[in-house]
Amino acid sequence: MKQYLDLLRHVREHGTYKEDRTGTGTYAVFGYQMRYDLSQGFPMLTTKKLHLRSIIHELLWFLSGDTNIRYLKENGVSIWDGWATPEGELGPVYGEQWRSWKTADGGVIDQITEVLKEIKRNPDSRRLVVSAWNPAVLPDPSISPDANAAAGKQALPPCHCLFQFYVADGKLSCQLYQRSGDIFLGVPFNIASYALLTLMMAQVCDLQPGDFVHTLGDAHLYSNHLEQADTQLARTPGPLPTMTLNPAVKDLFAFTFDDFTVSNYNPDAHIKAPVAI
């Protein structure tokens, strides 16, 4: 994916060194946008192998409204383990904000369901927005992620914090605003995850997939990922794979792992890099 490699190269060449919460240090730029035409293939990196199983299960977990990592662990996904309480709780993170945003009067808003209804009812709406950024439940930075979760706050503030859908010419597009992007490890997952969400939403709304637009705020490369980034930049991207969804599924919340099939995915070898916690 040239778009992603261009981002990696841009930050490698122009990033400003900054200290960060984890103490690792980053090279960062502020404000960067990529666009992927989903009719041209599924945007999953070919210059290193991605763990698609984790991407799919995490998205299904978000959409279920769950905030405990039990489902992920049962399906061999460990990407959230480092922030959860011993009981597996993460506090009111993505799933709760997407599906059960708490209101001041004691009610809840299912943002995903409301947006689905609005796409079908009024596809020209400019309000097809889902937000995970809820200041009332942001974590206290002076205590650990698991302590925040135990106190009813988010273990981590949402990195991919707001997305918007757009319908034109029978196609559904999605734009994600990501306030903070770990370019080497996190961003490739985010691209594939939101591209997949767009395919799913398009199918259940009887639309064709359009573009996935990815807007990054603080786009950063951790200082202990520089060698890995250079390794990836030396590789040549191959053709994008194809993602096929079970056409019988017409309910967004009825998708299961077995409803997704990726074909023609022939990536280069995985590149290992440490996670900054």
Curated annotation (Swiss-Prot):
Give the record's pathway.
Pyrimidine metabolism; dTTP biosynthesis
Where does it localize?
Answer: Cytoplasm
Give the residues the record marks as binding dUMP.
Answer: R21, R126, R127, R179, S180, G181, D182, N190, H220, L221, Y222
Give the reaction(s) catalysed: dUMP + (6R)-5,10-methylene-5,6,7,8-tetrahydrofolate = 7,8-dihydrofolate + dTMP
Kindly give the InterPro entries that the UniProt entry links to this protein: Thymidate_synth/dCMP_Mease, Thymidate_synth/dCMP_Mease_dom, Thymidate_synth/dCMP_Mease_sf, Thymidylate_synthase
CDD domains of this UniProt entry? TS_Pyrimidine_HMase
* Positions annotated as active site in the UniProt record: C159
What EC number(s) does its UniProt record assign? Answer: 2.1.1.45
* Record keywords, A-Z: Cytoplasm, Methyltransferase, Nucleotide biosynthesis, Transferase
Q: Which GO terms describe its molecular function?
A: thymidylate synthase activity
User: Does the UniProt entry include the keyword Coiled coil?
Assistant: no
Describe its assembly.
Homodimer.
Concerning its family, UniProt says: Belongs to the thymidylate synthase family. Bacterial-type ThyA subfamily.
The protein's job, in short, is: Catalyzes the reductive methylation of 2'-deoxyuridine-5'-monophosphate (dUMP) to 2'-deoxythymidine-5'-monophosphate (dTMP) while utilizing 5,10-methylenetetrahydrofolate (mTHF) as the methyl donor and reductant in the reaction, yielding dihydrofolate (DHF) as a by-product. This enzymatic reaction provides an intracellular de novo source of dTMP, an essential precursor for DNA biosynthesis.
Q: What is this protein called?
A: Thymidylate synthase
Query: What gene, per UniProt, encodes this protein?
Result: thyA
